[in-house]
Amino acid sequence: LITHASQTDDMATRIPDSHGVYMVPAFVGLGAPHWDPDSRGLICGLTLGSTQAHIARAMLESVAYQTYDLIRAMREDGAMRTSILRIDGGMAVNDWFAQFLSSMLKAEVERPVNIETTALGAAFLAGLQVGLWKNLDEVAATWKQERVFAPKMDPAQRRIMIDGWHDAVRRTLTPPAPVAQPTAGVTSIRAA
């Protein structure tokens, strides 16, 4: 479908929507909040009009939907509410994705100047250990914002898309094991 991740931004913006295509990337099952190690990946909603761009966009959308599900689960578990999410890593350079994520979360999404913060975090820990920084406040002061994305999507459209995602996820979940039935030779006890 694509040869490099950088192509996905152009593919996602070339079309107005995913045309009802959803991708559930359950290649090794689903983790939180679904906890189904036996579920399998799924692409659904394909039609004769579906293109590579629709599938690529559905892939990007799936990351935002998974983030939505995780944050919702954290809030239901009593986690502190926040109106800002900071992103990093390779997908963070994709403006379309960052905007979509912001709309799905109904929260601002902040992208740092340096998107490779995983490696930077290891460097910060080493620097703290040798005394380069005195405390975490000094480390936090080094973070620089490159751009902020604010939610833009119509709430009704957002709800339709999230409901479509949850329908797709339900299709991947392993059905519960059947309830064991009494075996031959076992009698039931009846009240007289």
Region locations from a protein language model:
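Active-site core segments that coordinate phosphate-bearing ligands/cofactors
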Residues: 1-192
